[in-house]
Amino acid sequence: MIESPFAKYRSILVDGDYSAAGFLQSFAMSMYAGAAFPLDASGLRNLDDAHMVAFQEMAAWFRRHGESDPDFVDACKAIKANRAAYARRIKSHLDDLLASDPDSYEGGRGEHASSVRFYQREHETNIARRWID
């Protein structure tokens, strides 16, 4: 029996933390729940040959099997859980920053304000991505 590409490339889909892995994760999620997780296809341009093969295998497999592949569903649930955990960490860090004294912050008030802006933007992006409510 042929192995599901969602099992074959699971480590990339679930544990990958680089741009090509992120694109493949987004591609899988767009097949899993396209209305909630639309795909910016411009990321195709960043795939090297090995990741392009993974993309093509996943697309062909999904075309034949849809959501009936338990490896596909499992990988997507893991991606969704990872993204939610990341978004919660960002929100927690933002909350900690907002509760802290800017004058006691390492780097001073300016660094504190910069960090708040960064984490606020990242949190807002995570809400827009539907990674967190």
Indicate residue ranges for each PLM-predicted region.
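Short terminal alpha-helical segments
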Residues: 1-33
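General N-terminal targeting signals
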Residues: 30, 45, 61-64, 89, ...
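Structural recognition of alpha-solenoid helical scaffolds
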Residues: 5-8, 20-23, 51-54, 71, ...
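Generic structural signal for hydrophobic core residues of well-folded globular domains
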Residues: 12-16, 31-35, 59-62, 79, ...
